[in-house]
Amino acid sequence: MLTMSELSEVEISEILKDAEDFANGKESKTTEQTFVANLFFENSTRTRFSFEVAEKRLGLDVLNFSADASSVQKGETLYDTIRTLESIGTKAVVIRHEQDRYFDELKDQVNIPILNAGDGCGNHPTQCLLDLLTIKQEFGRFEGLKIAIVGDVRHSRVARSNAEALTKLGATIYFASPEEWKDEDNTFGTYKPLDELVPEVDVMMLLRVQHERHDHYETDIMKEYHEKHGLTVEREKRMKEGSIIMHPAPVNRDVEIASELVECERSRIFKQMENGVYVRMAVLKRALPNVLGGMKHELFV
């Protein structure tokens, strides 16, 4: 589970169905002891802890890896780290890494599933899937929806994964971004001014300003960003009836979105976080039987 590109529409539908079942109260537990390791080389709150909650709800034994306290500090490669975990009996790894496509060196080299929890500016498939679940719960469909992805498109793995998947599922994607943060390589959407999109779209998907990937992050610059490119209270009032606000979080309040809108009636930001657990349960349940005897292996009951 590395990118959204590898999933067909049918596979996406199956994962979302499993996630909906979990959201509706379905329970599933492992029938045998199964170890899963979480390796986060970048800071994370939502993705890391929702994966851990998902793993524990499935009855998995969780190994939380700390790069600072591991042999990575002695020069051990990512490949050797994964092979070590595989050798001691770990059945899957969840990896967040600052390097784009870190998994290219691991594909076809290890024999356990790799669940990509975000690679640099590249991909974030489980974030995309939880966003898809949130949209599906709201509208019951993807076909014909208009989605605005707003903000730092160039540096956003969320923008890439969502634009590709939503286009595949029949939605129309628009981008709104400061000129210096446009991603001309992302061909899944059309750029338009934010104020043109506000009254037209069904989903306003805001992106975090990634100050850790920029050289400057000053209060006055962020205030200007909010006024020009953020979802202000005035812009929210012009949004289409029935439209919703989404954000992958963490939220920079009064930068990407006015603080009072984070939990407004349109906002689904915390619903997205809740859905993250269900989607990650579905992805784990799908990945693990493959390594333990195929999809028919009764690992979960």
From Swiss-Prot:
Keywords: Pyrimidine biosynthesis, Transferase. It catalyses: carbamoyl phosphate + L-aspartate = N-carbamoyl-L-aspartate + phosphate + H(+). Carbamoyl phosphate binds at residues 46-47, 96, 124, 127, 249-250. L-aspartate binds at residues 74, 157, 208. Pathway: Pyrimidine metabolism; UMP biosynthesis via de novo pathway; (S)-dihydroorotate from bicarbonate: step 2/3. GO terms for molecular function: amino acid binding; aspartate carbamoyltransferase activity. The keyword Manganese does not apply. InterPro entries: Asp/Orn_carbamoyltranf_P-bd (IPR006132), Asp/Orn_carbamoylTrfase (IPR006130), Asp/Orn_carbamoylTrfase_sf (IPR036901), Asp_carbamoyltransf (IPR002082), Asp_carbamoyltransf_Asp/Orn-bd (IPR006131). One of its GO terms (biological process) is 'de novo' pyrimidine nucleobase biosynthetic process. Disulfide bonds: none annotated. Its EC number is 2.1.3.2. Belongs to the aspartate/ornithine carbamoyltransferase superfamily. ATCase family. HAMAP family: Asp_carb_tr (MF_00001). Catalyzes the condensation of carbamoyl phosphate and aspartate to form carbamoyl aspartate and inorganic phosphate, the committed step in the de novo pyrimidine nucleotide biosynthesis pathway. Heterododecamer (2C3:3R2) of six catalytic PyrB chains organized as two trimers (C3), and six regulatory PyrI chains organized as three dimers (R2). This is Aspartate carbamoyltransferase catalytic subunit.
